[in-house]
Amino acid sequence: MANLPKSSVNYPGTLTPLEPNRPSPQPDRTPVPHSPPVVASPIPPRFPQPSFRPDQMSSPSMKSPSLLSPANGIRTGSPIPRLSTPPGPPVFNTPVKPAAVPFRTSPATPQPMAYSSANSSLPVSTPSFYSNGSSVGSQRDLPDVVRMEEPIAADSPYVLFSANKVLKQKKLANVASLGFGAIVSAGREISPGPQIIQRDPHRCLNCGAYSNPYSSILIGSGQWQCVICENMNGSKGEYVASSKNELQNFPELSLPLVDYVQTGNKRPGFVPASDSRTSAPVVLVIDECLDEPHLQHLQSSLHAFVDSLPQTTRLGIILYGRTVSIYDFSEDSVASADVISGAKSPSAESMKALIYGTGVYLSPMHASLKVAHEIFSSLRPYTLNVPEASRDRCLGTAVEAALAIIQGPSAEMSRGVVRRAGGNSRIIVCAGGPITYGPGSVPHSMSHPNYPYMEKTAIKWMENLGREAHRHNTVVDILCAGTCPLRVPILQPLAKASGGVLVLHDDFGEAFGVDLQRAATRAAGSHGLLEVRCSDDILITQVIGPGEEAHSETHETFKSDAALSIQMLSVEETQSFSLSMENKRDIKSDHVFFQFAFHYSDVYQADVSRVITFKLPTVDSISAYLQSVEDEASAVLISKRTLLLAKNQKDAVDMRATVDERIKDIALKFGSQVPKSKLYSFPKELSSLPELLFHLRRGPLLGNIIGHEDERSVLRNLFLNASFDLSLRMVAPRCLMHQEGGTFEELPAYDLSMQSDKAVILDHGTDVFIWLGAELSADEVKSAAVLAACRTLAEELTEFRFPAPRILAFKEGSSQARYFVCRLIPAHKDPPYEQEARFPQIRTLTTEQRMKLKSSFIEFDEASFCEWMRSLKVVPPEPR
């Protein structure tokens, strides 16, 4: 998203397992003396209210808390850089929501925090105590104030900061080339644990922030001080205690992450809460204009799909071509359907007659499995002699019909009202070509004289349909396959506005079938709202993710609430929001605070408020700040800001140049000049960052690997909404080499891994490649065993990833091997000492093996990583 004017905010547009065993540093301990008492008074709002636009979102000065995640090495401190432009509201954009990998698949287990007195301004309205802890008047033995003394770094898969410390100096913190921000995900479903609280939270009456482990507590009166606005608040006596140990019994005062859960079946029209996850309906909307080869694959995928559904899942089946066929499950062992015209939107009267008739259009799987198989077996290939792209497809009318049968008889009662149904309903479209008939359609030929206007009209209509689906708590996923051009710009708004995803597949085979199953069963909350609050020194300048501006009437507001509020289109751990932040001024305090609050209804119909609070230390030292930078999180944030501007191939070429300039600027601002040279050394603390960005500029997101603009558009939208783990893999592939004994060694993604006696797995997010060397392939028995081991690992690595990646296996020298080779850094051109420094495994090769490896490469003009860095007049950093 591009930055909007100050008060505008836009969202583009969503966490996989963290890397295990990565330590999380703790912030510096800096005990602060108590500050003198201050009379509490209302604090006026300090941040402008964010405003949103369709493709971008800027927001007020908000801060985002960050919990640590071991796998991704999240840290507790984080610098706050600012863009070079004047502060403005965050920019929000909403590209397609990919079901990427969540931040971490391991559940977060926040650790309890210790308490102690610290600096705070407290009101003199509590005569029994002074803010410095000394007793007065009655001379009670109780300490006056209890406050967090040393925050313990808690592991969290939900928030990742680009650094775990914040620079105090505004000028340095806001260097745009590096930047500061956070990647935030709603995370996994709630699980039993001490973090669950089944009562109303204590919130600041002034700004709306929640009580947390960093709040100062007057244990004599139970008052607590907000860390965001410093307002004093009552606790209705709940926080009155004789010692700080008693306060540790409150999860919100001892854990940085808590889930406030309110249960109860408040939603009409669904079964009890215990069964609600599987009761939300799934409606398949299937293209009937397929040729026989595609149809056979689709039928196999559909049969497997219904067999995988839970018995209580309610299923609907709709076919579309020139007409819309809505299948009736009331006829046992027979495929029976009611047919409506696809030329225009179905009228309310016709749908009412259908729904109130004798037909059953949504039926639980335990009662309709046999009928579903009969319906799929009855499908026939397209018989007319019409090119694929010119066949009439009324997808828009079919989705409208699907929405109508999901709403059912209660639709007219809910007119103008947002009904809260139990769990997200899903419409899954199986498409093999463009929408060319009925509402939202475009002409068969792009040379039609009125095509640009008709395309614009169709895009707007599809976006409105997506918004209507979201209003009725229904997600529309569009799974496309085949070789026919799909006119992605028209289909994309429907998926995006409803909170769904659009995915392209080569065919309707295995990968399509896996995605079909994962689309229907992935956990997703509804009615999501994200609130971000932070210290007054921090400004959120841009938001990228699957959401849009939340209007004030849709959520609770407070007197001086400066929170950035985002309406989430879907609540899934496979998606995330990327927040860019700046310093509003030089920071005087030793810490800054961030608080994220996710409000949503989960799949079990419980209302959940997930609150995450974090305290990051501030530093003057540039070196200390750079050491706290998380290269991977920083690279993902930079990549998302870059991809937001790369809307087409021409933009992508321009963005490669901006990556080059970014590297040069970081070296200039934070590096050092080489003596007696015009070269600059890249900061050694950021040793991994330039290589990650090199992968970005030459990979499928910005490079020339993907040829068709539809594929590029889908990949871009998927990336902008993806969770941290999937985003990282889409930027920089992970390379694993099979070793003797069945183990795998992780190596840099360099072409030096292409050793003829080895097998290599390359995980690039949406694609996983298995490369078998020629020497290994010659031994059929051994290569079969190695291939099986590689496939098993590839499936394990991507087990919960959505969309499911393609897994392709090929031999060295085959035509498909080019997909693998083009994603590896061409390090074979570097001198031996650089190869050994950056790819240590090569030291294990004999001289003969190294010569053989070198001779296997075909020379071409593309620069290696080291050559690229030197072309920018920058000395590459030594690898860690």
Curated annotation (Swiss-Prot):
GO molecular function term, any single one: zinc ion binding
Keywords: Cytoplasmic vesicle, Endoplasmic reticulum, ER-Golgi transport, Membrane, Metal-binding, Protein transport, Transport, Zinc
Protein name per the record: Protein transport protein SEC23 A
Annotated transmembrane regions: none
Record's bilayer topology term: Peripheral membrane protein
Record's subcellular location: Cytoplasmic vesicle, COPII-coated vesicle membrane; Endoplasmic reticulum membrane; Membrane
Null allele phenotype: Despite normal fertility, impaired pollen coat exine pattern formation with reduced sporopollenin levels, associated with altered pollen germination. Plants lacking both SEC23A and SEC23D are semi-sterile and exhibit developmental defects in pollen (especially at the late uninucleate stage) and tapetal cells, including defective exine and intine, as well as signs of cell degeneration and structural abnormalities in organelles of the male gametophytes.
Tissue specificity comment: Mostly expressed in seedlings, roots, cotyledons, leaves, trichomes, leaf primordia and flowers, and, to a lower extent, in mature siliques.
Subunit structure: Component of the coat protein complex II (COPII), composed of at least five proteins: the Sec23/24 complex, the Sec13/31 complex and Sar1.
GO cellular component, as recorded: COPII vesicle coat; cytoplasm; endoplasmic reticulum exit site; endoplasmic reticulum membrane
Keyword GTP-binding on entry: no
Major place of residence: membrane
Biased composition (Polar residues): 1-13
Ranges of Pro residues composition bias in the record: 20-36
Source organism (scientific name): Arabidopsis thaliana
Source organism phylogeny: Eukaryota, Viridiplantae, Streptophyta, Embryophyta, Tracheophyta
